[in-house]
């Protein structure tokens, strides 16, 4: 014989948990339906965070600017070392560096000693030699101060690149937070 009993009641899970994301955004994919049974660690949903995406885009733009700046300063350093202007006067990105190098070269030419005028004026060879040595010393001081200034700019630009890259890496490391998993 079979006995059938009908009773009214509600079945509840022994563990009920509410899940929230640490980022705001819109749910792009749901891997389960509401009320489904899940196991610990199951993937529940994917969230697209517009705030983080905008922050990442902004950081990538900054990184590009700082990297270009770093490249330009390295090129300027090479210009001074090679005594050649590798920048284009017509390229808007090159112009500040082109003119920076040209200013340096103008200062060098102002400090360069021309003995012919002094010889014609009757200066002695000893006086001319002293003036030439002083002029050479000033040109060397200008060279080293320019190299030091450019090197400091390179260090600063590299620091900016490293800082923004670290922020991007930290942002990308948190990419797992875009996914919601069942609590463990």
PLM ranges: what are they?
Residues 1-24, 28-31, 180:
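N-terminal beta-strand block that forms a small beta-sandwich/beta-barrel module immediately after a flexible targeting
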Residues 28-179, 183:
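Long, charged alpha-helical "stalk" segments
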């Amino acid at each position: 014989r079979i006995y059938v009993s009908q009773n009214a009641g509600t079945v509840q899970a022994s563990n009920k948990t509410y899940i929230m994301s640490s980022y705001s955004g819109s749910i792009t994919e749901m891997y389960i339906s509401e009320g489904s049974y899940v196991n610990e660690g199951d993937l529940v949903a994917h969230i697209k965070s517009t705030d983080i995406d905008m922050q990442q885009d902004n950081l990538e733009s900054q990184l590009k600017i700082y990297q270009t700046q770093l490249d330009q300063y390295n090129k300027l350093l090479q210009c001074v070392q090679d005594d050649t202007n590798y920048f284009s006067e017509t390229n808007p990105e090159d112009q500040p560096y082109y003119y920076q190098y040209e200013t340096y070269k103008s200062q060098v030419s102002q400090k360069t000693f021309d003995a012919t005028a002094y010889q014609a004026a009757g200066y002695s060879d000893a006086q001319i030699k002293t003036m030439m040595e002083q002029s050479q010393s000033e040109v060397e001081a200008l060279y080293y101060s320019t190299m030091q200034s450019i090197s400091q700019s390179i260090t600063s630009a590299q620091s900016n690149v490293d800082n923004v890259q670290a922020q991007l890496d930290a942002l990308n490391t948190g990419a797992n937070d875009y996914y919601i998993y069942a609590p463990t």
